[in-house]
Amino acid sequence: VLFGAVAVGWVLADQLTKWWAVSSLQDDTIDVVWTLRFQLLKNYGASFSLGAGYGVWIGILALVVVGILVWKGGSVRSRLGAVALGMIVGGALGNVLDRAFRSDSGFLQGGVIDFIDFQWWPVFNIADIGVVCGAILLVISTLLNPEPDASDSAGETSSSTIESN
């Protein structure tokens, strides 16, 4: 439940902020503080605009990854892991929605809306924050809650059985 709630919440936050960016930043840049500004861009590639000619393949790959994460999401044992996977899935889906439906050229031909600009880092969006921070949290969750080793539990069972005889 937590995994799904985080994923849905992240998609909604991402799409609402992109809606705001598209409606408010068409011909404008808003300086927020220091080097942070909001500036509307469309990214037809992956991270850092790499692979701009492969938008359809990037979209298909993202859908496959989301499918795998949703499948694995049901078996997550920790709350932190559930939040992390929810952020990754929500972020990936937010960007896939842009690719799928923000295009005049056809399905999965659209560009991802990016608008958060620090001027010293590539422009990004809320979905990107979910994917990156979710991945970091997933690593932390994995380090804090390692999967039990099947050979360890089998070894404990057999040694306790041997000791009791």
What are these regions (language model features)?
Residues 1-165:
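Alpha-helical transmembrane bundles and membrane-interface segments of multipass inner-membrane proteins
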